[in-house]
Regions:
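Active-site loop-to-helix "anion-binding N-cap" substructures in soluble metabolic enzymes
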Residues: 2-316, 320-394
Length: 394
């Protein structure tokens, strides 16, 4: 269970000139996000100076984390950038920072709170910055799934493996039931470890990362995988299907990566002869199978860094990152385009904008703790256990 808190530390409250733009302060408000179109317009440039001034006033008391999918206007104020796990570890390595401002989404801030010290306070600039995929697996649904596995007589054979992109509750469930967490970079190692512990894996919440890793990296077949739908009785599966399966995949997906299609790949190859198609493993299996290269966000960045001048690339991942990489490598003559013709970005990531960041930094600078993300101790203990198992992977 996670609580989001707004606490006044000073009897003189900070004037909140920047409102929350009418958004609900509900981290679980985003479910099944549809593509909202092109990126929002840049925020008022006058806010840049306000953000800079507030950050300078806070000094070493604040450490700002910026996920790769954040807007440029926000990333410019990040002390470090990276994927969710790297950022959580970076925060833990800065114990002198009283405030960790996480420019990302809710589950990321939870992970940072789990890995940082008790005296550090993790803040999310907009509490409505949730994650539709993380919300696709609730603690109640996963507990019910475990009951189904128990009734099928296989629970003792199953090891849960949860993607980093999951809530603290799901990470805790995983830790409590002998499982581990994985990232898109180490999913193969996590599965290898899990199959040393048991005969089957319950992979959640992203079906595509689980399927792609099992088939592409582990040599399994699509028939070895079954899809558990939490909205159907018994997950829509028979006991016989569960007993025969090696991989029990949760019916969850990323709303952005799930939009890329086989048609997207075919179209870009027709439009740009000689293009290299590079996609994230959260994409559908047929997209991954049709791509030239597949890898995590960090893999994508390193691949483009190493790419020769004049090469052409179509990238299947979040739009903010693709645009940033296209601009970065344009002087080297590398042509980088978004894989799909329909422009789409992660709308929940983009809830963290410059007005919210300014409001957060100015509030903290005036002594007002806002939008704190705090995981309860029992949940934290089991979630940390699952994360520690991941850290111990070879």
């Amino acid at each position: 269970v996670t609580t989001a808190q707004t606490t006044e530390l000073d009897v003189q409250p900070t004037p909140l000139a920047l409102l929350l733009l009418g958004r609900e302060a509900d981290p679980k408000s985003e479910r099944g996000v549809e593509c909202p179109g092109d990126l929002p317009s840049p925020s008022d440039p006058d806010l840049v100076e306000r953000a800079r001034a507030a950050k300078e006033k806070l000094g070493d008391k604040v450490f700002v984390l910026g996920h790769h999918y954040q807007r440029d206007e926000v990333i410019q104020f990040a002390d470090v950038t990276g994927d969710s796990f790297k950022l959580a570890r970076d925060a833990a390595a800065r114990p002198e920072a009283e405030y960790i401002v996480f420019c990302g989404v809710h589950f990321m801030a939870e992970s940072a709170d789990i890995l940082t010290g008790d005296d550090q306070k993790v803040v999310l600039p907009d509490l409505a910055a949730g994650c539709s995929m993380a919300d696709m697996a609730t603690a109640e649904q996963v507990a019910e799934c475990w009951d189904v596995l128990t009734e099928a007589g296989i629970a003792e054979q199953v090891v849960p493996v949860s993607y980093m992109n999951s809530s603290a509750d799901i990470k805790a469930f995983t830790g409590k039931h002998g499982g581990t967490i994985c990232t898109s970079s180490n999913a193969k190692k996590a599965l290898e470890w899990a199959f040393e512990q048991g005969e089957k894996v319950l992979f959640l919440p992203d079906q595509h990362l689980g399927r792609n890793t099992a088939v592409r990296d582990m040599g399994m077949t699509l028939e070895d995988c079954v899809l558990y739908n939490p909205h159907k009785p018994n997950g829509g599966l028979t006991a016989e299907e569960l007993r025969a399966a090696k991989m029990i995949l949760w019916r969850g997906h990323c709303s952005v990566h799930g939009r890329f299609s086989l048609e997207s790949v075919r179209d870009v190859r027709e439009r740009i002869p000689g293009v290299n198609v590079l996609v994230h493993p959260e994409c559908k299996h047929e997209v991954v199978a049709a791509a030239d290269y597949v890898g995590s966000t960090e893999y994508i960045i390193k691949a483009l860094e190493a790419a020769p001048a004049g090469s052409k690339w179509a990238i299947g991942t979040e739009l903010n990152l693709v645009r940033r990489l296209a601009n970065r490598f344009a002087p080297e003559g590398k042509e980088i385009v978004f894989l799909d013709k329909t422009v789409c970005f992660c709308s929940t990531m983009n809830r963290i904008d410059l007005p919210h960041l300014v409001w957060t930094l100015e509030s903290l600078a005036e002594g007002n703790l806002v939008n704190r993300i705090e995981v309860d101790k029992e949940t934290e203990a089991f979630a940390k256990l699952a994360l520690e198992r991941m850290l111990a992977l070879p």
